[in-house]
């Protein structure tokens, strides 16, 4: 991936590894470089936030490894000191792009699923719910068979301890690619209306 800042500075990166990819520890090596003039402290802060919202949230096979490295290097060759917010934004965009490419390269991968949780009591609660859905082998089987089975999504939420993510099952709504197949804990539109040939948004 290569991105360009408003003053002409650039940031780019490459990543290797798409097996043993699970949140926070994975068999992967990622190197991101920039020609911007930035301090080590600024790079560390930007990368920590970016990694938390990209590499630390992807899951290919549910298996972890300790061989996990993401590097951000700056040469300063452009002579440009970028706006801090823009730098943070582009670091995050680079990490998100690279992490999604890992997903696409997963061994035997046939579907790319993006899970968004709204209405949770906290970000930690939302993350716990999202990871429970992503880890569901029953859901993976359903998706592999091009069946957006909302019951398996809802049941996976039940594996999250209520003290971690309290919720009312009668208020759960599930949309898949813009089609509301579950509303207030019950059946919504027919799941046959969901287009399963494209990137899945749940």
Residue ranges of predicted features:
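Conserved small/polar residues in nucleotide/adenosyl-binding loops
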Residues: 201-202
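Glycine-rich, mobile lid/loop segments that gate access to catalytic sites or pores
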Residues: 1-53
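A glycine- and small/hydrophobic-rich beta-loop-beta segment
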Residues: 76-145
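Short acidic, glycine/serine/threonine-rich loops at helix termini
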Residues: 22-27, 43, 126-128, 154-155, ...
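C-terminal hydrophobic structural anchor segments
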Residues: 139, 143-197
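Acidic, glycine-rich loop-and-beta core segments that form the ion-binding/anion-interacting portion
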Residues: 42-98
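Short glycine-rich or small-residue beta-strand-to-loop segments that form or flank ligand, phosphate
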Residues: 12-15, 29-34, 70-75, 112-119
């Amino acid at each position: 991936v290569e991105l360009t800042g408003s003053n002409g500075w650039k940031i780019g990166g490459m990543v290797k590894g798409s097996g043993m990819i699970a949140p926070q520890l994975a068999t992967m090596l990622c190197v991101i470089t920039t020609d911007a003039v930035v301090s080590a402290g600024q790079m560390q802060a930007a990368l920590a936030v970016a990694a938390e919202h990209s590499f630390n949230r992807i899951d290919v096979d549910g298996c972890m490894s300790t061989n996990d490295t993401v590097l951000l290097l700056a040469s300063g060759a452009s002579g440009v000191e970028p706006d801090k917010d823009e730098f943070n934004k582009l670091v995050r965009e680079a990490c998100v792009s690279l992490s999604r490419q890992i997903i696409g390269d997963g061994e035997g991968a046939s579907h790319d699923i993006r899970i968004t949780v709204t209405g949770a009591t906290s970000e930690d609660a939302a993350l716990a719910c999202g990871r429970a859905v992503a880890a569901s082998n029953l859901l993976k089987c359903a998706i592999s068979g091009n069946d957006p089975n909302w019951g398996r999504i809802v049941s996976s939420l039940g594996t999250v301890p209520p003290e971690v993510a309290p919720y009312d099952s009668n208020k759960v709504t599930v949309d898949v690619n813009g089609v509301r197949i579950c509303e207030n804990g019950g059946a919504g539109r027919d799941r046959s209306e969901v287009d399963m040939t494209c990137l899945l948004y749940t």
